[in-house]
């Protein structure tokens, strides 16, 4: 199954955190392409936070979507992610953005990612590695990104 995963971090050494997360992701997916790393300002936060480093990767997995989500949460925990408030600073954040174009609305997972369409820090790196990318239910990634600018 083709999967698009967004990565982000703004605590500790964010670039190193992303690189370590990518290595751990190789345990559960075959990574085909990884975007450049992008430095972005925190999105929709009330407190002062450091800038984020963000990236997107595309890969293949044999796992089902919910099992892959469990693996991502486990990787986050192993890399020191502490969950507190929404949009809090974080050592690592891993999100499934798209999973083979599936639409899933379960207790533990919503696909496609419900806020990806409004997040330039997801759309820009995704467009870099897949210029024809489509976000199921929302349209072409290049058009979604253009609408944000």
Model region roles, listed by residue range:
Residues 1-28, 35-41:
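N-terminal beta1-alpha1 ligand-phosphate binding loop
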Residues 2, 52-54:
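Short, solvent-exposed beta-strand edge segments and adjacent coil->beta transition regions
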Residues 12, 35, 43-52, 63-70, ...:
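Flexible, gly/pro- and Lys/Arg-enriched active-site loops
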Residues 28-31, 98:
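A SAM-dependent methyltransferase catalytic signature shared across enzymes that methylate proteins
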Residues 60:
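Extracellular and analogous surface-interaction loops
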């Amino acid at each position: 199954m083709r999967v698009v995963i967004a990565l982000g971090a703004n605590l500790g050494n964010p670039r190193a955190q992303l690189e370590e997360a990518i290595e751990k992701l190789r345990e559960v997916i075959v990574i085909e392409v990884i975007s450049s790393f992008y430095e972005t300002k925190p999105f929709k936060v009330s407190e002062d936070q450091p800038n984020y480093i963000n990236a997107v990767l595309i890969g293949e997995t044999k796992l089902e979507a919910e099992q892959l989500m469990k693996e991502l949460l486990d990787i986050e925990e192993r890399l020191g992610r502490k969950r507190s408030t929404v949009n809090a600073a974080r050592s690592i954040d891993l999100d499934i953005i798209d999973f083979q174009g599936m639409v899933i609305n379960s207790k533990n997972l919503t696909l496609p990612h419900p806020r990806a369409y409004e997040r330039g820090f997801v759309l820009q790196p995704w467009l870099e590695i897949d210029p024809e990318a489509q976000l199921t239910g929302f349209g072409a990634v290049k058009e979604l990104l253009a609408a944000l600018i």
